[in-house]
């Protein structure tokens, strides 16, 4: 996948309501025989169906590999999404991957949901 194609991968894909697990993932073009990775981007993925953070990462990384990209999980936590109140709160951590940099996650979420109040905290699980 060419670096320009990374722009076609949505920065944020989260469920519309509820409290659920999320992961922050760095996606980059698959390197060829040790060649340096030209460009990467971080994406936020959070879904109610996931029992574990690894379930999200495994699905997303599999999808990205099919598109010619490599991934690394940068951490995770939970998202509380209240669409009626237009509020999203990002918090906590994942036992498997550690805490994500919630500040990065919330900036990406704010870009997708500009009319929402988006907050974050490191506490909670």
Curated annotation (Swiss-Prot):
<feature type="binding site">
    <location>
        <begin position="94"/>
        <end position="96"/>
    </location>
    <ligand>
        <name>substrate</name>
    </ligand>
</feature>
<keyword id="KW-0963">Cytoplasm</keyword>
<keyword id="KW-0007">Acetylation</keyword>
<dbReference type="InterPro" id="IPR038596">
    <property type="entry name" value="Janus_sf"/>
</dbReference>
<feature type="active site" description="Proton acceptor">
    <location>
        <position position="53"/>
    </location>
</feature>
<feature type="binding site">
    <location>
        <position position="21"/>
    </location>
    <ligand>
        <name>substrate</name>
    </ligand>
</feature>
<keyword id="KW-0904">Protein phosphatase</keyword>
<comment type="function">
    <text>Exhibits phosphohistidine phosphatase activity.</text>
</comment>
<dbReference type="InterPro" id="IPR007702">
    <property type="entry name" value="Janus"/>
</dbReference>
<protein>
    <recommendedName>
        <fullName>14 kDa phosphohistidine phosphatase</fullName>
        <ecNumber>3.9.1.3</ecNumber>
    </recommendedName>
</protein>
<keyword id="KW-0378">Hydrolase</keyword>
<dbReference type="Pfam" id="PF05005">
    <property type="entry name" value="Ocnus"/>
</dbReference>
<feature type="modified residue" description="N-acetylalanine">
    <location>
        <position position="2"/>
    </location>
</feature>
<comment type="similarity">
    <text>Belongs to the janus family.</text>
</comment>
<comment type="subunit">
    <text>Monomer.</text>
</comment>
<dbReference type="GO" id="GO:0005829">
    <property type="term" value="C:cytosol"/>
</dbReference>
<dbReference type="GO" id="GO:0101006">
    <property type="term" value="F:protein histidine phosphatase activity"/>
</dbReference>
């Amino acid at each position: 996948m060419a670096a320009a194609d990374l722009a076609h991968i949505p920065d944020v894909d989260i469920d519309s309501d509820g409290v659920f697990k999320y992961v922050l993932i760095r996606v980059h073009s698959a390197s060829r025989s040790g060649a340096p990775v030209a460009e990467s981007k971080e994406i936020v993925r959070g879904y109610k169906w996931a029992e574990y953070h690894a379930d999200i990462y495994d699905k997303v990384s599999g999808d990205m590999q099919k598109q010619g990209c490599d991934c690394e999980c940068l951490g995770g936590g939970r998202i509380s999404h209240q669409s009626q109140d237009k509020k999203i709160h990002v918090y906590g951590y994942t036992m498997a991957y550690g805490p994500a940099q919630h500040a990065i996650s919330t900036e990406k979420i704010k870009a997708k949901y500009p009319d929402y109040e988006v907050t974050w905290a490191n506490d909670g699980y």
